[in-house]
């Protein structure tokens, strides 16, 4: 077996192991669940659908999966929808395309990123509720959770982050993040090994704002202490914040 092939298989096993661990530790999936997978076309959501589909096959189809892409009419980005549909079919799931749009919020000053995210989320909620899905799987990885924790510490004075599982108040739906224990570096390697292309072209708002700046700060912290990310992750779990 070639070295690259061995590395790819080892990486696949490592990521799958961490997904399984997260699903068990945070009780993310139960038999009979009907789960929508938010498929943007980026590496994270592509990996999410792949590993959940692998779990589903190994669990004899004890839960249902369906991939959903929300197309934003007023955000200048492009996605190869045919590629997403074919990828979902390869993973053994259905595929649904939803259209949505948001209006700029000049009075309250909410960012375009917030409005876009909330509009997508609401479209997913409405579809899930109308079609009998009780959970929505999102592709946030461990670095996303750590970054959110740093944002909350810095700007809100709170020690909190996105949780692995979150039951919505106004919808009979639970958000789950099965990649929450997976490092982004592993997802990048997985995308390279499997030649899964991130079909989404760069969002115009992707490198604007405090969150992008925080990425640089966290890189500096990692240089200062190579165990920084692991220490923060341990603290979040010890405090029951994940």
Where are these regions (language model features)?
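Short, solvent-exposed polar/charged micro-motifs at secondary-structure junctions
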Residues: 106-109, 210-212, 241
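ATP-dependent adenylation/nucleotidyltransferase module used to activate substrates
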Residues: 2-149, 155, 185-193
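A short, charged, Gly/Pro-tolerant segment at domain boundaries
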Residues: 209, 227-242
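Residues that form generic nucleotide/phosphate-binding pockets
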Residues: 18, 22, 217-220, 231, ...
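Generic structural signal for well-ordered, non-membrane alpha-helical segments
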Residues: 12, 117, 207-210, 225, ...
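Residue-level detector of flexible, active-site-proximal loop/helix-junction positions
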Residues: 72-74, 102-104, 166, 182, ...
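Catalytic subdomain that performs nucleotidyl-dependent activation
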Residues: 64-65, 135, 143-223
């Amino acid at each position: 077996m070639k070295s690259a092939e061995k590395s790819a298989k080892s990486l696949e096993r490592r990521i799958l192991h961490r997904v399984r661990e997260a699903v068990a530790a945070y009780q993310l999936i139960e038999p009979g669940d009907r789960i929508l997978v938010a498929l943007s076309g980026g590496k994270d959501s592509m990996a999410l659908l792949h590993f959940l589909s692998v779990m589903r096959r190994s669990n004899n189809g004890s839960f249902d999966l369906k991939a959903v892409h929300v197309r934003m009419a007023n955000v200048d980005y492009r996605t190869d929808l045919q590629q997403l549909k074919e990828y979902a079919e390869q993973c053994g799931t259905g595929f649904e395309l939803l259209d949505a749009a948001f209006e700029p919020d000049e009075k309250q000053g909410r960012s375009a990123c917030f409005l876009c995210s909330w509009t997508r989320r609401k479209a997913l909620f409405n579809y899930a509720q109308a079609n009998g899905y009780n959970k929505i799987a999102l592709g946030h990885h461990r670095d996303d959770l750590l970054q959110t924790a740093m944002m909350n510490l810095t700007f809100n004075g709170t020690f909190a982050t996105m949780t692995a599982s979150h039951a919505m108040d106004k919808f009979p739906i639970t958000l789950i993040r099965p990649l929450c224990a997976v490092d982004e570096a592993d997802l990048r390697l997985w995308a390279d090994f499997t030649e899964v292309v991130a079909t989404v072209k760069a969002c115009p708002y992707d490198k604007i704002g405090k969150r992008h700046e925080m990425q640089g700060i966290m890189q500096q912290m990692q240089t200062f202490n190579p165990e920084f990310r692991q220490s923060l992750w341990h603290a979040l779990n010890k405090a029951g914040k994940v």
